[in-house]
Amino acid sequence: MAHKKGGGSTKNGRDSNPKYLGVKAAGGSTVNAGTIILRQRGTAIKPGDNAGLGKDHTIFALVDGTVHFRNGRNNKKQVDIIPS
């Protein structure tokens, strides 16, 4: 006979790895071409002037300049790069 109870199991003992999403370059900061400005799931914020969109919806700078967030058409958020 066992002298200790069985350990049992749980269905909750795991956690996903962090994804490090969010804004990487704040509005008003200067960036170089290729710098990641924002990592996101889906296109909550769309790329504007001089900003590109990666296949995982990452927004990055296409030119050297200053980051500028604004509300675009239909009040959708956009990120522009104002060339320096």
Curated annotation (Swiss-Prot):
Pfam families given for it?
Ribosomal_L27 (PF01016)
Q: Does the keyword Ribonucleoprotein apply?
A: yes
Transferase is among the record's keywords? no
Q: What InterPro entries does the annotation carry?
A: Ribosomal_bL27, Ribosomal_bL27_CS
Entry's SUPFAM superfamilies? Answer: Ribosomal L27 protein-like
In this chain, the stretch annotated as Disordered covers: 1-21
Q: Which UniProt keywords apply?
A: Ribonucleoprotein, Ribosomal protein
Q: Which family does it belong to?
A: Belongs to the bacterial ribosomal protein bL27 family.
Annotated protein name in UniProt: Large ribosomal subunit protein bL27
According to its UniProt entry, this protein's organism is Chlorobaculum parvum (strain DSM 263 / NCIMB 8327) (Chlorobium vibrioforme subsp. thiosulfatophilum)
Gene (name only):
rpmA
